[in-house]
C-alpha cells in the first residue's frame, strides 16, 4: 500500500464508534450511496430462499434504533449520564451526542434493551423514539 493509504487506515483505526458512524453518514451523503442497502438485500435473500413469508418477517422487528429526540434543559446532566451508561462513550463524546439531539444513541438493540433504555432516559427528562 502507499503511504497515503497507510495513513488513512491508521486514522480510521483510531476513530471511536460514534466518529465512525458519523463518517459513514458523511460518505453516504458525499457519494450518494447507502451502506445499509447492500445489507438489506443480503438479509432478504436467505428468507426468500427458505420459502418464508416476507410479510411475517417485516412485522416482527428484532433490532431497534434508540433515538434521543430532545430533553429538558434542566435534565441535561441526568440524560447525559444515562446516555453514557448505555453507550459506554466518554464524557465528551456523550455530551456531543446529547447536544446534537435528535440523534441515534444506540443501534441494533433488542426490543427489551431498547424499551429499557427509552424508559430510563424518559425517567430523567429525555424524549426518546424507537425505530
Curated annotation (Swiss-Prot):
Protein name: Large ribosomal subunit protein bL12
MF (Gene Ontology): mRNA binding; structural constituent of ribosome
UniProt record similarity statement: Belongs to the bacterial ribosomal protein bL12 family.
PANTHER family: 39S RIBOSOMAL PROTEIN L12, LARGE RIBOSOMAL SUBUNIT PROTEIN BL12M
Keyword annotations of the record: Ribonucleoprotein, Ribosomal protein
Described purpose of this protein according to its UniProt entry: Forms part of the ribosomal stalk which helps the ribosome interact with GTP-bound translation factors. Is thus essential for accurate translation.
Annotated organism of origin: Prochlorococcus marinus (strain NATL1A)
CDD domains with a match to the protein in the record: Ribosomal_L7_L12 (cd00387)
GO cellular component terms attached to this protein's record: cytosolic large ribosomal subunit
Domain of life: Bacteria
UniProt subunit comment: Homodimer. Part of the ribosomal stalk of the 50S ribosomal subunit. Forms a multimeric L10(L12)X complex, where L10 forms an elongated spine to which 2 to 4 L12 dimers bind in a sequential fashion. Binds GTP-bound translation factors.
Biological process (GO), any one: translation
Amino acid at each position: 500500500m502507499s503511504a497515503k493509504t497507510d495513513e488513512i487506515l491508521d486514522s480510521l483505526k483510531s476513530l471511536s464508534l460514534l466518529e465512525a458512524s458519523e463518517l459513514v453518514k458523511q460518505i453516504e451523503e458525499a457519494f450518494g450511496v447507502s451502506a445499509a442497502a447492500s445489507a438489506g438485500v443480503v438479509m432478504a435473500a436467505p428468507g426468500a430462499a427458505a420459502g418464508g413469508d416476507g410479510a411475517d418477517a417485516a412485522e416482527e422487528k428484532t433490532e431497534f434504533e434508540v433515538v434521543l429526540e430532545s430533553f429538558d434543559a434542566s435534565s441535561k446532566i441526568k440524560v447525559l449520564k444515562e446516555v453514557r451508561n448505555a453507550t459506554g462513550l466518554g464524557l465528551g463524546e456523550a455530551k456531543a451526542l446529547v447536544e446534537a439531539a435528535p440523534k441515534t444513541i444506540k443501534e441494533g438493540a433488542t426490543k427489551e434493551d431498547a424499551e429499557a433504555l427509552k424508559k430510563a432516559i424518559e425517567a430523567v427528562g429525555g424524549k426518546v423514539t424507537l425505530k
